[in-house]
Amino acid sequence: MKKKLLFLGPPGAGKGTQANLFCKKYGLIHLSTGDLLRDEVSSGSVLGIKAAEIMNKGELVSDELVLSIVEGRLLNINEGWLLDGFPRNVNQANSLKDLLEKINQPLEGVILIKVADDYLIKRLVERGRQDDNEQVITNRLKIYREKTSPLIDLYKKQGILEEIEGNADIDVVFSCIEKSLG
C-alpha cells in the first residue's frame, strides 16, 4: 500500500471524508490544509484574521503561507501521510515536489475524486460551514477549474494519478480508492 498520498478534487468532492477514513484504516497522518487554516482562523491570530478575509471571499490563501504550514507538519512525520487540499495550483505542486525531494519523501500516489458541479453545490450548501454560501461556492469552483485542474495533467504525466468517481456512497468511493492504491 502506498504511504505518501495526495487527494485532489473540487470543493465538496469528499476528499476530507475519504482521507479521514483512509488514514484511520491505514495509520497515515492526515494533513488537511483546510483544517489547518480553519484552526488558524479559530485561534484569532493575526495570520488567522488575514486567512479568514481571503477564505470568506472564496479565494485561495497564498502559496507561501500554505507551503510553510505543510512543510512544518511534514518535517515532523516519520510514517506515511495523506495531503488533502494542497497543492491547489502548479506553482504549489512544483514547490511541494521540491520540498518532498529535499526531505526524501517522494509522492507515491494521487487520487482525483470527480464529482459533478450540481452535486457539489448541493453538498456544500447542506454542509453548512460559514464559508459555504452559494456565491462563495461558485467562486471556489471557478478557481478550482482555473488553478487546480491543471494538476490533473501534471500528475497523469508522472504516472501517479488515479481517477475515482465521487458521486457514489461513501463506502463505495472508499472501496474504489483502496483498489486503486492496492
UniProtKB/Swiss-Prot annotation:
Assembly information from the UniProt record: Monomer.
GO cellular component: cytoplasm
Subcellular location(s) of the protein: Cytoplasm
Catalytic activity: AMP + ATP = 2 ADP
The organism of origin for this protein: Prochlorococcus marinus (strain NATL1A)
Residues at which AMP binds: T33, R38, E59, L60, V61, G85, F86, P87, R88, Q92, R129, R140
Name of the protein in its database record: Adenylate kinase
Residues binding ATP: G12, A13, G14, K15, G16, T17, R127, A168
Region listing for NMP, in residue ranges: 32-61
